């Protein structure tokens, strides 16, 4: 009887260690993966700040779908605070610099169902609460939001450079009814690479390496901004 109890206790302890070890190992793996990522190098955001911030976490996961472009020499900027004529700033989530143009990406790390029309000022996120019940949240039209970003960017770059607008939603949500009639791309994180490649394959324009580098250097001064700039941005856009 004593041996049986001892064996049961040992098994329970081993099971407890196993249950604790899995999330710890997962956390360590994710930490190491993040520390070696291009997103970490570009933004200097700490792992914990990204881990606990839904917006930054979405940008990080989105950035991983851009690794194929970065592996061929393309550059990215994240959290770019572009000055506007009115003294305010536009916070751009991601800019991909490609010989075919600039891809300005608005990241939406949302869940639930998404409803929206390009011409409507607000879109709707529907979240399940319990069976037969749901909760609705309105959010500003991301196409209009990104259009503001692009207008701000245009003030700082060569007029001949093509700029493409892409709205990328997390795969945790479903684009239930989204109507877009312009050339703006609304897609999921997982389809981002394919969406950008479709634009690239249909473009006959090419930016010279010199102009592309100049553009990157010019816009990079607006990334990795200090804390006061971020606070001022929030205050100005209340």
Language-model segments: residues:
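Short, flexible, mixed-charge acidic loops at enzyme active sites
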Residues: 114-126
């Amino acid at each position: 009887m004593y041996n049986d109890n001892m064996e049961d206790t040992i098994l329970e302890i081993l099971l407890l260690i196993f249950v604790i070890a899995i999330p710890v190992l997962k956390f360590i793996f994710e930490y190491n993966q993040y520390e070696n990522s291009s997103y970490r190098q570009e933004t200097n955001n700490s792992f914990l700040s990204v881990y606990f911030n839904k917006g930054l976490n979405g940008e990080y996961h989105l950035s991983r779908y851009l690794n194929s472009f970065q592996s061929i020499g393309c550059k990215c900027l994240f959290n770019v605070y572009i000055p506007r004529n009115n003294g305010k700033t536009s916070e751009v989530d991601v800019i991909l610099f490609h010989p075919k143009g600039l891809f300005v990406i608005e990241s939406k790390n949302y869940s639930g169902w998404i409803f929206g029309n390009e011409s409507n000022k607000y879109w709707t996120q529907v979240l399940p609460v319990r069976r037969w019940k749901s909760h609705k949240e309105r959010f500003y039209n991301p196409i209009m939001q990104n259009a503001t970003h692009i207008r701000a960017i245009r003030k700082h770059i060569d007029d001949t450079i093509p700029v493409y607008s892409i709205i990328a939603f997390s795969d945790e949500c479903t684009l239930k009814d989204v109507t877009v009639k312009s050339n703006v791309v609304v897609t999921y994180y997982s389809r981002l690479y394919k969406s950008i490649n479709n634009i690239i394959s249909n473009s006959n324009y090419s930016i010279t390496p010199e102009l592309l580098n100049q553009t990157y250097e010019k816009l990079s001064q607006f990334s990795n901004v200090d804390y006061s700039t971020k606070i001022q941005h929030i205050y100005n856009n209340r």
